[in-house]
Amino acid sequence: MGTINWTKDQQQIIDMRGCNILVSAAAGSGKTAVLVERIFKRITDKRDPVNVDQFVVVTFTKLAAAQMKDRLRERIEQALAEDPSNEHLLRQEGRLSLAHISTVHSFCSEIVKRYFHRIGLDPAFRMGTEAETRL
């Protein structure tokens, strides 16, 4: 992968620490690339590395969530090609399947499934289909 020339705003998002962020921009503006780089920088931070499954990344579409996970996998594999004995990166590659990268609906559904007892829902609840929600 060649060197990317990030804009000032993109670099600020990549480097920001100690807070949650919301990245909102037009289609094709590089949101996915910026978020992948931000996550990669955090999991490879020498002073304070985190595990990839400690992030919550929420997108609007299944395609965007899948692309995010695929690109993050590619970024980790690229780094492993340069340093195949990096145990932390090997663990991150394994943890990627546990990463919380999903759509808004999927994220909310997971929260409800996990905490149904606290909000008084039947544990067998299910999300309505598009047709059902139009009724």
Question: PLM features: residue spans?
Answer:
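P-loop NTPase Walker
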Residues: M1-G120
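Flexible beta-alpha connector loops of hexameric P-loop NTPases
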Residues: A124-G128
